[in-house]
Amino acid sequence: MQKRVALYLQDAHDLRNGLDYVKYAENRGFEAVWQAESRLVRDAIVPMAAYAAVTDKIKICSGVINNWTRNIGLLASTFLTLDDLAPNRIICGIGAWWDPLAKSVGIKRSKPLTAMRETVVVLKRLLAMERVSFHGEFINVDDIELDVVHGRREPRNVPVYI
């Protein structure tokens, strides 16, 4: 069995150096790079886009973003956009966040499991290019879809890891 190796990046490095690390990892056969999003230091999405732009094969993953600070439309369109940059190489790693940090920015994480389930269900349906209506405790959308006018309309292969 072939070993699977990935690179995990947080915020201890300069972003420009991160580009070099990811290219190095890709050239050495690493399967993936995971970009952390933690505390209030570094967003994961911007580095992921940069990594996608300078690589050709390595999978680009969020490790992890939270399901509270981006609405479901923004979350889905963000991962659609990343998939446009790196088709079939994007993975959405998503978690329920850290309660002390959530509270400090005014977010009450009630029923985190229910909120996560709703997020994942609607996100996957939107990335499958479905028109979605969903009425839950945390997500309420009526007849929305990713409004791709120009570009790829096919369902996107963006795995969601919890």
Which stretches of residues belong to each language-model region?
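Internal, glycine-rich beta/alpha segment that forms the wall or movable "lid"
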Residues: A76-I162
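Generic structural signal for well-ordered secondary structure
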Residues: G18, V41-A44, W68, L75, ...
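Structural motif corresponding to the early beta-alpha repeats
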Residues: C61-S77
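Conserved N-terminal glycine/acidic-rich loop preference
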Residues: F30, W68-G73, L101-K103
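Active-site-proximal loop/turn and secondary-structure-junction residues that shape catalytic pockets
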Residues: D11-H13, R39, N66-W68, A96-P100, ...
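Short, glycine/charged-enriched secondary-structure capping and boundary segments
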Residues: D20-V22, P47-A50, L74-S77, V105-R109
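N-terminal beta1-alpha1-beta2 module of alpha/beta enzyme domains
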Residues: M1-G63, V158
